[in-house]
Amino acid sequence: MVLKLSANPLFKAGVSMHPSHPKICEQIQENEESLLKDIKCPQLFLSASNDGASVKLGGLGKQVLGDALEIVEFPDMLHGWSIRGDLSDPTVERDVRKAFNLALEFMNKYM
């Protein structure tokens, strides 16, 4: 999990496409706010339309991480689009390309 690894000072940045940590925290009974507070490096969340409120603008992630978190929302996408989206759909292909380009730019900025 990107956020767990991001608590290690050896990591310089983290990118989460359609972040699923809110659901995972719920399933393993871990406090999401505590998980976020442990993060030691900048983060980029690329959120789909049906991802939870905590990974969107104004959500818990932004409240806890502040300027250390960038969020880009993809209102036309559903959770999982970047790894299992139908690339024959031009809208999905467009947003997958955009997401991966944003991720590369973000990582290059901090590496």
Segments from the language model and where they lie:
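Short beta-strand/loop motif that positions the catalytic acidic residue
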Residues: 38-40, 44-47, 74
